[in-house]
Design a protein with these regions (language model features):
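Terminal peptide-recognition signature
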Residues: 42, 46, 60-61, 79, ...
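Glycine- (often His-adjacent) and acidic-residue-rich active-site loop
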Residues: 81-115, 130, 241-242
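Amphipathic alpha-helical segments at domain termini/boundaries
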Residues: 2-6, 26-41, 45, 188-220, ...
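Short alpha-helical scaffolding segments that buttress acidic/His motifs in well-ordered protein cores
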Residues: 182-183, 231-234, 250, 254, ...
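Conserved hydrophobic/aromatic "anchor" residues
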Residues: 65, 86, 152, 270, ...
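Crotonase-fold acyl-CoA enzyme core
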Residues: 113-226, 259-260, 264-268, 274
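Charged catalytic carboxylate motif
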Residues: 56, 60, 107, 114, ...
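Conserved CoA-thioester-binding segment of acyl-CoA-metabolizing enzymes
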Residues: 1-14, 18-82, 113
């Protein structure tokens, strides 16, 4: 499996607010960060280790998420991998959450929650193999586009452990039916099957991955930023409510959005047959 042509940007952050002191340094860096066209690209950068989730990598990933969330130029966040794999899972020699230089590391649970709670959409661009803990990133992401031939596996049972933490973000997508079989067997499946079982939204040939991800970025950038953030909350909130609670809460929610400045601008733009202010010309 190879990365798609027109690979994501691999430079350091273009955001001047990034504070290097908040990110433990590794040489080379375990992640890469760049902003392009409204998207912050966070690239897992341990290709020789198949982008395994080390303590340093997860610390950097978490810090980059905070940078992207705080940057008004960033409308969405893209997670991808450098090299032939997306992410092979946790690094068993230096697992996430390990103490580094006397500081407690960010746990896998912490970073998955950070992805889900981010007010900006997180897109997973699956360029290659996604195994075990790496599937936690897939489960936590809001939109998932994958190479059709990329191999997936909840492989934990093969070494006598279980996909415990990542089940929290993967089971809501898989459901009990698919989750049970995939967790029990650790079987491999490809990107097309990932779409069928609910882990991914779209599977494309490798050479089409960049364009497919860009289409998602463009769609998000065309939408109101506050509306997008509220939609993330909406999708997670409604299933927690009873039917009557949901109707009451969403009716009030809808009213707030229609009366908001962003809602007024969007409706005015529609009436005047122009682009709303948040769409860059």
């Amino acid at each position: 499996m190879t990365t798609a042509p027109d690979s994501p940007p691999t430079g350091s952050s273009t955001n001047p607010s990034t504070n290097p002191s908040t990110i433990p340094s590794t040489n080379p860096p375990a992640t890469l960060y760049a902003v392009r066209g409204g998207a912050a690209w966070i690239t897992l950068n341990r290709p020789d280790q198949r982008n395994a989730l080390s303590a340093a990598l997860v610390n950097e990933l978490d810090a980059h998420l905070s940078t992207a969330i705080a940057d008004p130029a960033v409308r969405c966040i893209v997670l991808t991998g450098n090299g032939p794999a997306f992410c092979a899972g946790a690094d068993l020699k230096s697992p996430p959450g390990q103490v580094i230089d006397g500081r407690q590391g960010v746990t896998l649970a912490d970073v998955l929650a950070h992805i889900q709670d981010a007010p900006k959409p997180v897109i997973a661009s699956i360029n290659g193999a996604a195994f075990a803990g790496g599937l936690g990133l897939v489960g936590a992401a809001d939109i998932v586009v994958t190479v059709d031939a990329a191999p997936f596996s909840f492989s934990e049972v093969k070494i006598g452990v279980i996909p415990a933490v990542i089940s929290v973000v993967c089971l809501p997508k898989l459901g009990l039916h698919h989750g049970m079989k995939l967790f029990l067997t650790g079987e491999r499946f490809n990107g097309n099957r990932a779409v069928e079982v609910g882990l991914a939204h779209r599977a494309v040939p490798a050479e089409q991955l960049a364009a497919a991800v860009q289409a998602e970025i463009d769609a998000i950038c065309a939408a109101g930023p506050i509306a997008v953030a509220e939609c993330k909350k909406l999708v997670r909130r409604v299933p927690q409510l009873t039917r009557d609670e949901a109707f009451r809460e969403t009716t009030a929610w809808s009213t707030r959005m229609f009366l908001s400045a962003e809602g007024a601008e969007g409706m005015a733009a529609f009436r005047e047959k122009r682009k709303p202010s948040w769409v860059k010309s």
